[in-house]
Every structure is written in structure tokens, then in C-alpha cells.
Amino acid sequence: MPEGPKTLELAHVERLLTFAQQSAAAEIGFGHLSSAGTIDNQFAPSTLITARMTFSFTIASKLGFSEYTSLAERGVKALSTVFHDDDHGGFFSVAPGFGDAGNKSAYDHAFVLLAASTAQSHGIIGADALVDTALSTLFSRFWREDLGIF
């Protein structure tokens, strides 16, 4: 009987993942989903959503849902390329070509680090370099020595 709740919880996780994987229908990274599970094009492709979904799909893969490993890899690749500012470092809040892609925030960078470090712990290709980039950017651009915070 103790296995019952665990099985029920994993069934719920599987339903959530089935819904969440629809975010991969976006052309860039992962898209914002409507409550119906379709991409909501009112929102630009963002670092935040891409990082959150990368984290989620990596956790899913770690839980044994191996079919989500490729989505975790997709997220790491998008964060490392499309959302990365090759000229000035760091990560754009939204993908270039969508709104003001020049904006950057510590919040977005923290989510990139969360996604990257989780992916790194699961051996996702490209995650090591993404961790290094996110961590160095957080400390070089957002760390406030005078306050001891980001």
C-alpha cells in the first residue's frame, strides 16, 4: 500500500509534463502556454520561461522520464546561443528581434544558473559552460559588494 501515493504522484507529474512539453512548439526556446496548452504569442520568447522549462525537463529526466532529456538539451542550447549576448555578455531577457532584447536582469540570470546547474548535475551537454557563463555574469554584473547581494 505505501507505493500507492508515490504512483499517484508520478501519474500527476506525467500529466503536468505532457502539458508542459507543448511549450516546445515555440520556434525559440520554450514558449508561454495558455491555459489551453497552446503557445501564447502575446509573449516574446523569454530567458525566464526557457530557463524554467529547461529546469523542469531536466528534473523530469532525473525522475526517469527520459523522453524529456532532449527538451532539457534544447533549453540549454537555446540559453547558450539565442538568449546569450555574444557582444557584451550575459543573457537577454527576451530573444533578439522580439521587443526590447537589450534588457537583462539578475532575476533572469539566476534562473539560467538554476537551469544550467540542474542540467549539469544530470550530464546535459553544454550545461558545464552555461553554468560558468551564468555564474561569472551574475558576479561580474549584478553582485553588490556594498550590500552583499545580487
Residue ranges and their predicted role:
Residues 1-150:
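Glycan-recognition and catalytic cores of secretory/periplasmic carbohydrate-active enzymes
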